[in-house]
Every structure is written in structure tokens, then in C-alpha cells.
Amino acid sequence: MIIGIGVDVCDISRWEAAVQRHPGMVRKMLTHTEAVMPARSQAARFAAKEALYKALGGGEGLSWQDCEVVTDGEAVRFELRGSLARRAEELGVRRVHLSLTHDAGVAVAMVVCEG
């Protein structure tokens, strides 16, 4: 059963400009592993987290640091902990599907939470 679906788009040049203006934004929104990646990968991970929040019904009370987008070979997946793991458990989420892409200056993420 599908519990939630989320989609988000992030313009990579806007992400880069925002990071230039607010350097602390990266530390707040991305884990250390994500923060050292190229801008296009950072933007994709930001979009992934936004899509996850949408799929879980909103981001209130959730920490950006409580999820990390992990690459396993060609596939990407979330590692959830803390507030995000609790929210997923409360909703009955058993599996989170994640798809990421970046092309033509845009990063796109789609998340499906399955129970």
C-alpha cells in the first residue's frame, strides 16, 4: 500500500547561489558526507529530502540531519534515523523508494513511501 508520494525539483544554479549567500545552509540541510559532494549532487539530495518530507506528510518536527541519501553502486536510498525514522514508523512505512536525476541544470527527486 502506498502511504505517501513526494516530488521535488531544485535548480542547481539557485542552490549554488543560496549556498554562496548562506554557507551554513549546507551544514544544516546536508550530512557531512553529502556536503562534500559537487553542487549538482547536493541539490539532488536536498530535493530528495524535500520529496521525502512531502511523502511523510510534512517536515514539521523533522531534522534534516536525520536522513542521508546513500549511493549503493548505481542505486540511491535513504538512511533514516531519529525523527524521520520515528515518523516513518508511526505512519507504517516499511519501504522508501527514491529516484534521483540531474540534467540541464535541474535536480529532480521522487519518493514513494510504501507500507
UniProtKB/Swiss-Prot annotation:
Coiled coil: none annotated. It is found in: Cytoplasm. SUPFAM superfamilies: 4'-phosphopantetheinyl transferase. Its EC number is 2.7.8.7. InterPro entries: 4-PPantetheinyl_Trfase_dom, 4-PPantetheinyl_Trfase_dom_sf, ACPS, Ppantetheine-prot_Trfase_dom. One of its GO terms (biological process) is fatty acid biosynthetic process. Keywords: Cytoplasm, Fatty acid biosynthesis, Fatty acid metabolism, Lipid biosynthesis, Lipid metabolism, Magnesium, Metal-binding, Transferase. One of its GO terms (molecular function) is magnesium ion binding. It comes from the Bacteria. GO terms for cellular component: cytoplasm. It is an enzyme of class 2 (transferase). It catalyses: apo-[ACP] + CoA = holo-[ACP] + adenosine 3',5'-bisphosphate + H(+). Its main location: cytoplasm. NCBIfam families: acpS, pantethn_trn, PRK00070.3-2. Belongs to the P-Pant transferase superfamily. AcpS family. Transfers the 4'-phosphopantetheine moiety from coenzyme A to a Ser of acyl-carrier-protein. This is Holo-[acyl-carrier-protein] synthase. The gene is acpS.
